[in-house]
Each structure stands twice: as structure tokens, then as C-alpha cells.
Amino acid sequence: MTGIEQKTPVGGSETGGADGLYAVLPLRDIVVFPHMIVPLFVGREKSIRALEEVMGVDKQILLATQKNAADDDPAPDAIYEIGTIANVLQLLKLPDGTVKVLVEGTARAKISKFTDREDYHEAYAAALQEPEEDAVEIEALARSVVSDFENYVKLNKKISPEVVGAASQIDDYSKLADTVASHLAIKIPEKQEMLSVLSVRERLEKALSFMEAEISVLQVEKRIRSRVKRQMEKTQREYYLNEQMKAIQKELGDSEDGRDEVAEIEERITKTKLSKEAREKALAELKKLRSMSPMSAEATVVRNYLDWLLSIPWGKKSKVKQDLNFAQEVLDAEHFGLGKVKERIVGYLAVQARSTKIKGPILCLVGPPGVGKTSLARSIAKATGREYVRMSLGGVRDEAEIRGHRRTYIGSMPGKVIQSMKKAKKSNPLFLLDEIDKMGQDFRGDPSSAMLEVLDPEQNATFMDHYLEVEYDLSNVMFVTTANTMNIPGPLLDRMEIIRIAGYTEDEKLEIAKRHLLPKAIKDHALQPKEFSVTEDALRNVIRHYTREAGVRSLEREVMTLARKAVTEILKTKKKSVKITDKNLSDYLGVEKFRFGQIDGEDQVGVVTGLAWTEVGGELLTIEGVMMPGKGRMTVTGNLRDVMKESISAAASYVRSRAIDFGIEPPLFDKRDIHVHVPEGATPKDGPSAGIAMVTAIVSVLTGIPVRKDIAMTGEVTLRGRVLPIGGLKEKLLAALRGGIKKVLIPEENAKDLAEIPDNVKNNLEIVPVSRVGEVLKHTLVRQPEPIEWTEQENPTAVPPVEDEAGASLAH
């Protein structure tokens, strides 16, 4: 690099002449003063290049402290403008790539501007001159500084006593001020302030001020250390420790109003309605506490235990409201629909009004996300007048989260059940256990097994927490749990009363949007009702084309989007109001996300609409089948699991056994391959409920008869052609209604479940119970297949086909 050779000589700038050009070394967490010799460890590439450049041409370098030590590549404005010109005495490269350099500060300098050099920092700077001052005043200050510095070093053990001797021999008072400043334990900005001061008198005054402040702090620290040391020597003597505690209380002014801690705990034990076992345990622990030193670690453990034992509610009950009309009003006002849950709650209150011995029910609300399970629990608490506490079980894997840690462990505490009871402050709250199906288990135990005791009405009256070690009565607690699926261990499931919340119909969603979601959006976005309105047709359009869910969470997000864009439009265009209609809806929400109506526009061969149940509600399931020349292979695709594959095999075997009744020549099976595909290919699918849909698809493919586009179906099929019942009927019917299906075929054994289906679903769908495959094909195929006569030519004594239970409806 030849640019360094063109630098202005440093000598001119030391005398206050024109600016010189210097390589700049930014420093972290250190300020180098003139006359100091300091070792530095340099690791940044720019800094190493600057040092190599200076060493190569034997020039001086400018040391400037950066404002933020964490900044790896500081900008010019992130470096203090006052620095120190220094000579590089020695440079040593270390094995790890860093450099150790020994520098000696010579003079203060002020940076005027940085150059645009990229390989290292470079700047123009001029050495600064010290002003002429009164020598007598400076000498007096210097003597005070040396005296205070001697006291400072005596108190601060980190500084070598030899430094005091060296400082007292310095005749140059400027050098004395800088030497003292470099050894002070003050912050970097304060040291930089000392460097920036040119006046020797001001520097000595600042050094004196900083030292006096530090000496005061160090003296207090010394007194504290001495006092602690004396106290430690007396720890074995209880009398003196107690006297010391009294002395401390007197110093704090608490002696008059303060109360004896043991007496206070004893009074709390007397006033609290503890059980007999808990009272005996509390008194035993109190007796133990009396004999302990108050400062011992064990005393702290006992105090914490007694505090927990006395803080949880013992026999403190909320007055449960028994007004059935009030409860019904609260539940109806905050949640639309959900009649079965409301009926169960009101029924419990009715029985409780007649009998005080009834135990709290343990309800499990099972349903897809967004149907209001968690918020319903809060409404139940309000309707019954109970305190509300919530405990989320999602991801809980440690049994100690439920039962607590034993007191042998440091930092142990009760489990979340007891902690929540303390938070409730009453012994009969409504306790929500959220996401109970999301609990896991690992080497630390199985929390679902620990929940068995909590949720068993026969056992939870004597719930034992590992920390408390006494029985606690949970029988008055009303437990409500929520889950998305029934994926809950059997013994735990058996202890709960399952209430399914299948999801909302379109009309229910519309009412929820009008009663709850729109007013909430208006309130949350600081709108006035007259400023923002959405027509009923627009809301219905949002439900149909922008959401596809069992709950209303996505619907709420879309309504919030409308409100947010309405606020933006009002502020931008100064409109007085925004009205969302069916016509301008797409301007606010964009293109439609979902298609509402039938999946296919025409009747097609081999294309059948089935119905599926998922964790988020029901879905339409398209099943496609094609036939091609081959060797009789059956191919299934669409990420199907074992049960569904077996269902397809059973359907294919059934069709093959009844081939002549469907007008299919048996040799055709050996000459054709059939491929059944279930979109979407990336989504795993399982279950037997698509059996009759598979039979319909295979028969349609082999006969060439199209399937009606407006029919959906669900039901398991047997090898004898019977249609078996399925689960999740309500969710599947809601999915059919959302998809614009006109007719739904369900198993005859599920007809009894129609009583729980909302009337508007039954009124808008033609629901046909079927018990045989023959009945299914009558409804699903555009025309019925004609049976054929067929005999085995190679085997004249062919066994006549066995007529199955569906034969009567198909043959002849």
C-alpha cells in the first residue's frame, strides 16, 4: 500500500499545526490516555491492517474509543472524536490470528474528518494544546489528588500499591491527572470525558470528584463486609442472632409495628378452616420452625411450606347461583346454539337447587377448533357464580406439573392444580383443563395418569399433592375439559361426561356474526355502528366463499379484516361510513378462496362424492376411479392408510362377487386394471366410512354408468353388501350442506342420530337411510345396471352364485 507514504508528518500536528492523516484504531471498553503504555489485543481485520500499515512505515496511530463496544465495524459517527496519538512499541501476532500490540500514548488529538478508505479506518486529526493556567492552584489540586489517590488505592485492592509511589513522583501535573484517571474504576463515558478536557486544573478537579465518590462507596462496602463477617462469626449463637434481627428491625423502623412471625403464622393456622390432618401437619411444622435459626435455609423451606398450606382455600366456597333463568340468559347471551351443553348445565343447577350433596360434574367438550369450547367454560362460570381458573395442558409432559415436587428438592413447589386453587381463592371454582388431548408423556412420568385422581369424583376428595403431603378436597370443584379429538387415554375418558360440539350450520354462523363478531369488530377498531355495516347477504357470502371451517375463527378474522379496511378507507377518503354488500365484498377481501356448491358440474363415470370427518369438522371427499387395459390389478393412491385400503379391497371383492348382477362379464376383471384415487394426495386419509362410495365408483367404472353429481354418501360396506353405521354424522351432514349437496345417503342404523341434527340441516338436505348396497346404487347411478346371464364355458358345472342380502334389490 503506497498511500501511507504520502501522509503528513506527525510532528507538525503535535504542535497544534495543520491536521495530520492518521490510521485510526477503534478501541472497545478502554480509553488510552497520553503517557500511558498499554497492551492491546486486536482481532478485527481492519484494525490489524491499520497496525501493519503503521508498523511498515514507522508512523504514529490514532487511538479512539468507540461508543458501542458491541459494534464490530463502527461507523465514523460511532467513534468519539477526541482520541490519543500513540506510538506502536511492539507488535506480536498470536497463533489464533489475533495481534497483541504495545502502544504508548503521546498527545490528545481531535478528529476533524474520516477518509473514504475501506481497508481500515483513516482520519484527519490535529494534536490539542493545553492552555496556560495558574501554577499555584494546580499544585494545590495535585497534592489533594495524590492524597485521595493513596486512600483510594488502600480501599481498592485491585490496584497495586506501587502505583501510589509512582504517582507521587510525577512532576508533570498533566501526566499526573491522566495517570490517576486511567486507574479509576469509572465508566467509559466518564473516562472519555476526562480525556476530552484540555485544562489540567479541570482534569485534576474531575479526578478528585470521581475519587471522592468512589472512596465513599468503597468505605460503605468495607463496612458492610466487616459487619457481615462479624455476623457470620455469631451464627452459632442464637441469642445474638435474634438480637441482631431486632437491631435491624429497629434501624428500619419496624420494631414498633412489626409482629412476631411465628405468632402470625400460629394465628393464621387458628383462623384457617384446615382439615384435621392439615392442622396437625401445620402445627408440627410450626413447632419445627420455632426451634430453628430464622436465618437458616431449612427455616425458609418450612416458612414457604406453611405459606402455601395456609394460602390455598380451605372450606371457602363461592355462593353458587341457583337461578335457572339467569343461567339460561347468560349462556344464550354469550353463545348461540350449543343447546345440548346448555341443557346439561341448567340441569345440573336444577338438581343442585334441590340437593346440596351433589358433586360437581366433570364435562369434556369435544369439538373442532373455533366452536367456542374455552369461552363457553367462562360463560358457565359466570352463569353458576363460580370463580374461573384455567390450566392449559397442551404440551405438558411432566407428572410433577399436576402433583407438584416433593419438598426434598431445592425450589420445589405445588403442582398447577394447587397453584390454580390458590389463585381462585375459593374451594369450588370452575376449573378449565384446556387441550386435555394434547398431553404427552416421557421419562418424567405420565401426566394423564396423574389426572385420573383429579378427575375421579370418588377420589378427588382426597387429592394428595407431593409438596403439601396432606389430602385436599377437590370434590366441590366443577371441572370442564376441552379437546379437539377423542385421542384421550381410556381410563381418563371414562371419568368424563363427553359432550360433542360438532360445529355450526351456516345459519348459526350468520347469527353469531351478527350478534357477536360484528359488534366486537366495531368495538376493537374504535368504529361507530353508523360508520360500518355489513349486509346479511355479504356475511353469508363470506361464510360460503371465504371460510371453510366448523367453527367461526376464520370468519372472525375475515370480519376483522373488513373492519380494518373500513377504518383505513374512512381515514383516507374522509367518508362518513362504509357499507359492505354482496357486490363490493371482493374489493375488501379479494378473490373468493373456496367454491360453494357441487364439486363437479355434471354426472361423470367413476366420480363419487363421499363424506369424511376431520379434527376441524366434516369435509367432502372426492373419489375417482378409472379403468384401463391390463391384467386385473387394483391400484389405490391418495395417501391412504391401512383401514381405507382394506375398505377398497372389500368393495372390489364385493363387486366382483356380484358381477353378473351388475351386468359385468367376469372375464373383464382379468383384462382390465382399475385405479382408485382419492384427492388431495398430500393429505393422509383413513377409516372405513367411504365403503359404499368405493363400491359405487367401481360399479360405475366397470359398467360405464355415470354417478349423480348432487349426491354424497357415507357408510361402511361388508362383503355381504350390508351398510354399517359410521361416526361423525353431524359434521358430515354440515359439510354436505356447505358443499351444496342435495341428497345424502347414510346407514340405516344412523337414522336414530338424526334427532340431534339441527332442523335447518334436515330441511335443506334429503337424507336417505340405506341398509344394502342395492339401495345405494338405486339412488346414486343415473340408470340401473342390467343383470346378464353367464355360465363358465370351461366348467359347465359352475356353482350358482350365492345370493347376498342385497340381491333382492338388484337381481331381476
From Swiss-Prot:
Conditions for induction: By heat shock.
Subcellular location, principal: cytoplasm
Catalytic activity: Hydrolysis of proteins in presence of ATP
Location(s), subcellular: Cytoplasm
GO molecular function: ATP binding; ATP hydrolysis activity; ATP-dependent peptidase activity; sequence-specific DNA binding; serine-type endopeptidase activity
Protein EC: 3.4.21.53
GO biological process: one example: cellular response to heat
InterPro entries: AAA+_ATPase, ATPase_AAA_core, Lon_bac, Lon_bac/euk-typ, Lon_lid, Lon_proteolytic, Lon_Prtase, Lon_prtase_N
Domain called Lon N-terminal: residue spans: 22-215
Active site: 689, 732
SMART domains: AAA, LON
Alphabetical UniProt keywords: ATP-binding, Cytoplasm, Hydrolase, Nucleotide-binding, Protease, Serine protease, Stress response
Residues the entry annotates as binding ATP: 367-374
One Pfam entry name: Lon_C
Domain annotation Lon proteolytic: ranges: 602-783
GO cellular component: cytoplasm
CDD domains, per database record: RecA-like_Lon
Class in the EC hierarchy, top level: hydrolase
Region of interest: Disordered: 787-812
Assembly notes: Homohexamer. Organized in a ring with a central cavity.
Similarity remark: Belongs to the peptidase S16 family.
Record's function text: ATP-dependent serine protease that mediates the selective degradation of mutant and abnormal proteins as well as certain short-lived regulatory proteins. Required for cellular homeostasis and for survival from DNA damage and developmental changes induced by stress. Degrades polypeptides processively to yield small peptide fragments that are 5 to 10 amino acids long. Binds to DNA in a double-stranded, site-specific manner.
Record protein name field: Lon protease
Organism the protein comes from: Brucella suis biovar 1 (strain 1330)
